[in-house]
A protein has these predicted regions:
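Active-site neighborhood of HAD-like aspartate-dependent phosphohydrolases
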Residues: 1-29, 163
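Alpha-helical elements of Rossmann-like donor-binding domains used by nucleotide-donor carbohydrate transfer enzymes
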Residues: 10-14, 32, 46, 50, ...
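Short, surface-exposed acidic
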Residues: 19-29, 56-67, 186-187
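A short acidic, helix-capping loop that chelates divalent metal ions and anchors anionic groups
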Residues: 34-37, 102-104
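A metal-dependent, Asp-based hydrolase signature
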Residues: 35-65
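Short, acidic loop-to-helix structural element flanking the phosphoryl-transfer center
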Residues: 60-93, 131
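Asp-based, Mg2+/Mn2+-dependent phosphohydrolase catalytic module
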Residues: 99-187
Length: 187
């Protein structure tokens, strides 16, 4: 929700372009092991080494892969603009299926200082929709699920949160989302 479109789609397209390879070929290699990043088992260098093994002749330096990877983030400005508009009484937490280095950059970004809990899958070792991920978020927030609104763009994650007692709101389009927040008295 804080990024436009899908990061994975953008990184694989950008990488395919840099390698002059078909995007389908790059995506096959990327998606076969991206969970290793999401769960924090691998760093970017190990991930890139594995991709290179799957794509013989992919002669890109690790530093260039890292640059392409990190520059593929496209922020959803509307979500960042929304943060200061939320009342101070609304406590925020983030549960993100994320990657090493990206989570480090997010933690360093002052716009995230409003969040009481920042839970990243690569640091936790569990990702949405696993129950352990949601329980870590609740521990970070220090409140029961019944007092929390979980927002996500993936239905499977919303269903998992609802099963644990969270109220849920799906993020599809920003205006509809903010209307939903207004309806709930949060804006």
């Amino acid at each position: 929700m804080f990024t436009e479109g899908t990061f994975d789609g953008r990184i694989t397209a950008n990488l395919a372009s840099a390698l002059s390879r078909p995007v389908e070929e790059v995506r096959k290699a990327y998606f076969a092991k991206v969970e290793e990043l999401e769960l924090g088992r691998w760093g970017l260098d190990t991930f890139w080494e594995w991709i290179q093994q799957q794509l013989p002749g992919a002669g890109l330096a690790s530093s260039e892969f890292r640059r392409i990877f990190l520059s593929s983030v496209q922020e959803n400005a509307a979500m960042y603009d929304l943060l200061p508009r939320l009342p101070d009484s609304v406590e925020l937490g983030l549960l993100s299926n994320n990657y090493p280095e990206l989570s480090t950059l997010l933690r360093a970004d002052p716009r995230w200082s409003r969040f009481r809990a920042l839970i990243f899958s690569n640091e936790l070792g569990h990702k949405k929709p696993a129950e352990q991920a949601f329980l870590a978020l609740l521990r970070g927030l220090g409140c029961p699920a019944e007092h929390c609104l979980f927002v996500d763009d993936v239905l499977e994650n919303l269903e998992a949160a609802a099963a644990l007692g969270f109220q849920v709101l799906q993020y599809r389009e920003h205006q509809t989302f903010t209307a939903g927040l207004t309806e709930l008295g949060l804006l």
